[in-house]
Amino acid sequence: MEIKDWYKLTFQIESDSEDIIIWKLNELGIFSFSFEYLIKNQNKKEVNIWLPFDSWDNNSRSDFEKIISKILKINDSKNKFFNWSIIKEEDWLTSWKKFWAPELVGNHFLILPCWINLNEKFKDKQIIKIDPGAAFGTGSHPSTYLCLEKMENILFSDKKVLDIGSGSGILSIAARLGGAKEVCAVDNDYLAINSTNSNFQLNFGNLNNLNTYLGSFNEVILKNQLKQFDFVLCNILAEVIKGMIPNIYKCLRNNGEVIFSGILNSQKDEIIKILIQNNLKLLDVSSRKNWACISAQKPASNPKHKIYL
């Protein structure tokens, strides 16, 4: 579908909120954004986000505002925080597309914008095609990078994988590329579920081997009896992870492994402590910039855990 017009959303944030905004945009499959320092206040940044006009109705834009407001802990009851405008496609798309480039992650994965032809030098890589709405950058977050880097050393062949907080579907796609026989993707935002389905279809031509679930993790696993996973991928914020760990334990089969990301380096010790308290064995910790990735394993024999809501 040809995109004629775009919404441009502009708002201001404290500079130290940039990481969390990038993380959430990546989670939702939104990759067309920029951050600019304010000349008069270097402690603040202006955020610009471009969204396809035809795909973002009033309800979608309102829901998106609520998501950002919740993250930034603001009350925009007077609707003055967010500024929406309509931008003609020819005013920006052509000039920004030239800045797109394939993004190599680790040694094996390549994130490729869907309209760019694959260069011969990357033909030996595992290609993850992404359609971010003709944006000017993948905005790949360190937490996603860390997960993919960890995944390239895992044999997913014939394995069952759970992706919690699937977002744009990058990790689900990577697991399937690695040979996973079944991928279950869970997210509590319908925009993210739509993005996961769309990008999975783009890579494989169908939605075979993928099951998506909309809702909170704890509710979804109870309702759908999701269990006996070989691997769980959990790229979400540490505060959310803490409340999920007992149920993640329950979802894993014996000797199953979980990869946690979305954790700041300052939070990793607390997460590790909770993992150990829940009978998960720490396997590895890696970091990139200010973010950490933690992998753990469910031992073959442990006390039974209940699922908590």
Curated annotation (Swiss-Prot):
GO terms for cellular component: cytoplasm. It is found in: Cytoplasm. InterPro entries: Ribosomal_L11_MeTrfase_PrmA (IPR050078), Ribosomal_PrmA_MeTrfase (IPR004498), SAM-dependent_MTases_sf (IPR029063). It comes from the Bacteria. S-adenosyl-L-methionine binds at T144, G165, D187, N235. The keyword Transferase applies. One of its GO terms (biological process) is methylation. One of its GO terms (molecular function) is protein-lysine N-methyltransferase activity. It is an enzyme of class 2 (transferase). Keywords: Cytoplasm, Methyltransferase, S-adenosyl-L-methionine, Transferase. Gene3D superfamilies: Vaccinia Virus protein VP39. Its EC number is 2.1.1.-. It catalyses: L-lysyl-[protein] + 3 S-adenosyl-L-methionine = N(6),N(6),N(6)-trimethyl-L-lysyl-[protein] + 3 S-adenosyl-L-homocysteine + 3 H(+). Belongs to the methyltransferase superfamily. PrmA family. Methylates ribosomal protein L11. NCBIfam families: prmA. This is Ribosomal protein L11 methyltransferase. It comes from Prochlorococcus marinus (strain MIT 9215).
